[in-house]
Amino acid sequence: MAKLSNEELLDVFKEMTLLELSSFLKEFEETFDVTAAAPVAAAAPAAAGAAAPAAEEQDEFDVVLESAGDKKIQVIKVVREIVSGLGLKEAKELVEGAPKPILEKVDKEKANEAKTKLEESGAKVSLK
């Protein structure tokens, strides 16, 4: 097998969906017995520094699916509608794997719109 350059690897990753990347990351962690989590000691100073800007209004939100509720099929349909390029299988895995982020770093209007649609379909959703 030919060795891929860093640029070629990045091109391959750019073509993958978020779910495919997540699956790859889990497999990579298991294969090499490593974890992608940041050390806790390194994250603590960043959190202290972030407390001051917290007074400003947040302009980027993550839409997190907490639970699909009783109407899982309806929620899957709405997830496919909200997340562009998501196939039925990926949407189903995303819904069944809740709690999981559906959208990341979106503006307030889009986050509220997605939250409303998901809640109308029976899902429990939070904005972070």
Curated annotation (Swiss-Prot):
One of its GO terms (biological process) is translation. It comes from Saccharopolyspora erythraea (strain ATCC 11635 / DSM 40517 / JCM 4748 / NBRC 13426 / NCIMB 8594 / NRRL 2338). Keywords: Ribonucleoprotein, Ribosomal protein. GO terms for cellular component: cytosolic large ribosomal subunit. Forms part of the ribosomal stalk which helps the ribosome interact with GTP-bound translation factors. Is thus essential for accurate translation. The keyword rRNA processing does not apply. Homodimer. Part of the ribosomal stalk of the 50S ribosomal subunit. Forms a multimeric L10(L12)X complex, where L10 forms an elongated spine to which 2 to 4 L12 dimers bind in a sequential fashion. Binds GTP-bound translation factors. This is Large ribosomal subunit protein bL12. NCBIfam families: L12 (TIGR00855). GO terms for molecular function: mRNA binding; structural constituent of ribosome. It holds the Pfam family Ribosomal_L12_N. InterPro entries: Ribosomal_bL12, Ribosomal_bL12_C, Ribosomal_bL12_C/ClpS-like, Ribosomal_bL12_oligo, Ribosomal_bL12_oligo_N_sf. It comes from the Bacteria. Belongs to the bacterial ribosomal protein bL12 family. The lineage of its organism: Bacteria, Bacillati, Actinomycetota, Actinomycetes, Pseudonocardiales.
